[in-house]
């Protein structure tokens, strides 16, 4: 069907992935329900007491490509957080999504709950998707999850608020104080463990002070793994036959065995590169300088910023959320992996004893 390797990888549901889906739901079951939780804001001078309470968003519409596991994750997360969910998946995984939703609906009905709480749109026609995106009276938020084209289409055409889950152009910066063995492990895990996912590494930034020691080893490892390298002029001497990359070619989400590399003069240049070409998803520094790590975490604008840990941990299941509905790359109303709490909002609770405003 002319599907690329990244798409095929997302579509596959083998025993291991089915077990992982089930385990994710079991973790969600054990998590605290955020709905109804109150936090005290304070008491005003006039005596009124102010709190805020967690409430569901309402009706969530997921628009996604491939990834049948999204059907299970989104259904479980939305139900646990008190939301109804409409799931509009891609045609490639439609039968699988319908089968998963049917299982969830059977369980809902057995417990005298409306099966419409988890609904899969059975027709992937784009005209129907457009109609869904215009239902401001019935849908509270749309969460698109997929390729850049889908995200842009939904953002440009929806009349319902959208939480964007944009592409994952994730970088590893190898600092001059890096442990190069750690850096190599982070690089190979982030780039080659699973390439067709949004938390895979797409960029490597290396301080010039360690480039001579590190990049020849990278060249050997990538040759063995079959990784195609695009590198700037300063780093090209370490790679035989690598493409010398143009400035405007950085920022690509390859979703395969390809990577863009830049050798930089200093820490500030690394941060500038990430600011220009990252996608606010996940960024990693490898350094033994704790203060440099903290500075990186403060300076870099991304939903997840890591020190000496693989970008592949940028995932709801790995961060203790059980599963995620996606990884938000815009700051409204959530940022990063979205779990139960991200599927709620807050309302004010104000208690008084008859106070009136002067």
Please place each PLM-identified region on the residue numbering.
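ALDH superfamily catalytic-core signature
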Residues: 66-84, 103, 110, 150-256, ...
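A glycine-rich helix N-cap at a beta->alpha junction
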Residues: 106-120
